Regions:
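Short beta-strand/loop motif that positions the catalytic acidic residue
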Residues: 137, 143-145
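Conserved alpha/beta-hydrolase catalytic His-Asp/Glu region
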Residues: 64-65, 76-135
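Flexible "cap/lid" loop of the alpha/beta hydrolase fold
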Residues: 40-80
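Active-site loop/oxyanion-hole signature of alpha/beta-hydrolase fold enzymes
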Residues: 1-30, 189
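Short alpha-helix in the alpha/beta-hydrolase fold that links the catalytic acid
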Residues: 153-162
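Acidic catalytic loop of the alpha/beta-hydrolase fold
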Residues: 147-152
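Catalytic active-site module of serine/aspartate enzymes centered on a nucleophile-bearing elbow/loop
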Residues: 167-201
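Gly/Ala-rich beta-loop-alpha elbow adjacent to hydrolase catalytic centers
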Residues: 31, 35, 39
Length: 201
């Protein structure tokens, strides 16, 4: 069986195929983590299609910081290892029930899927050499990052925002890498004003 690796082109194609199938008009797209990265690609390449993009815990470049081979081995439970790796990215004060639910999602992935997704997230999706070409007048860009995110750190988000002229970056206190799932009530306080701003565009 061929090893699964999510590429930038495949990821963008899946999203645009969905939009085409449902014939969406003037959509706003929001993604988190690897989704936060791919929406920045779409802001660059599909600026006339999307009304705005919202990148949660997203940046235009990341560096790998743990060994991916642990995620797909016959002697290791991949789901439990995946949850262990990402558990450090959740803010300590996030509600326990939401922490567990977030980690439970990571325990459900099929063999090799998370490892293959990280190929895009850590390697193929980097485009810090081109992100400055995003035209935020055509497609406004909003970046939000949690202060407890040790993967896409606030510093990485802010560095990306500096490269994307006209983008708006917000660092959310008391939240980690999974704002919408680890602490939805806190997240709503920050995302709702942005949605209202976009609705007025």
């Amino acid at each position: 069986i061929k090893e699964y690796k999510l590429t930038t082109e495949l990821y963008k194609k899946m999203i645009m195929s969905f939009c085409d199938a449902y014939k969406v008009i003037n959509p706003v797209i929001m993604g988190c983590s690897m989704g936060g990265r791919v929406v920045l690609h779409l802001a660059l390449e599909q600026s006339n299609f999307f009304k705005a993009v919202i990148s949660l815990e997203g940046s235009d470049k990341l560096d790998a910081y743990y060994d991916l081979d642990w995620l797909h081995r016959p002697d290791v439970h991949g789901g439990e290892v995946q949850a262990a790796f990402v558990s450090s990215q959740i803010a300590p004060q996030s509600p326990e029930k939401f922490k567990h639910e977030t980690l439970w999602h990571y325990m459900q992935g099929g063999p090799g899927i998370f490892k293959g997704d990280l190929y895009f997230y850590w390697h193929d999706g980097d485009f810090d050499d081109r992100s400055s070409l995003i035209n935020t007048k055509d497609c406004p860009v909003y970046l939000l990052s949690g202060e407890y995110d040790c993967s896409c750190t606030p510093e990485r988000t802010e560095a990306t925002a500096k490269r994307i002229k006209g983008s708006k970056a917000t660092i959310i206190p008391g939240i980690g890498h999974f704002p919408m799932s680890e602490n939805p009530d806190l997240f709503k306080r920050y995302i709702n004003p942005i949605l209202e701003e976009i609705s007025d565009l």
